Amino acid sequence: MPFRRDVAHASARPDPGGAPMLRRMSKKVPKNVLRSVHGTSRRQEYSASTKRALVDVAQELFTERGYAGTSLDEIVAGARVTKGALYHHFSGKQALFEAVFERVEDDASSSIRRAIKDVKDPWEKALTGLRAFLDVLQRPEYRRLVIQEGPAVLGYEKYREQEERSTYGIVQDIVSSVLATYDLEPSMVETFSRVFFGAMSAAGSAVSSAEDTARASAEVEAAIAFILAGLRQQSESGGKLPGPDDLRGEG
């Protein structure tokens, strides 16, 4: 074939250093090295798939039965792995729950970030972010694992740490955008962010514990939209937010 002849001729030409390119191309990686690399790759792939299967099954069972109602035996049986494989990846049931919690939180924050990504107006961004969060609250795994089970299983400190890692930054970004028209100290912006973050956490608890989660979500949206509308009206009319010194009575 002409193509092969061309390649052969090109390969036979000497390189600038004088050594034929064909000779350089003929050098092969030792077979034992290739076997080692391929073996390591297969082991890593198997290890990752085992861990993923454990988290998948644990998420399903924790959501359906709760943390206390789920045993490690059920998880390894569902994932079709041994307990030794589980302990290779996780120190125990709580560590596995934490991995599930992180996944659910990360999925939630990714959904909210996607929803607000292209929204330029800060007020519309706040409402869009709120609605995206309320949509997340309709997910059974989020309500059960993050809102209901998370604080008790992880403990308050770790729970807050995980929440701040995943969703606090979103709230902080939205609040900073909304308050950009006000001449506020950074500490006041941080305070507003904390207050709104607390309000969203409380809203999550209210919705997750409601019999009619759709109705509860609509009520939360109406309440927070009302607060945002007041802030927007004040901003557009040239008003300003009082600082801590403005609220103190004269002695």
What are these regions (language model features)?
Residues 99, 113-141, 192, 196:
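Hydrophobic alpha-helical connector segments
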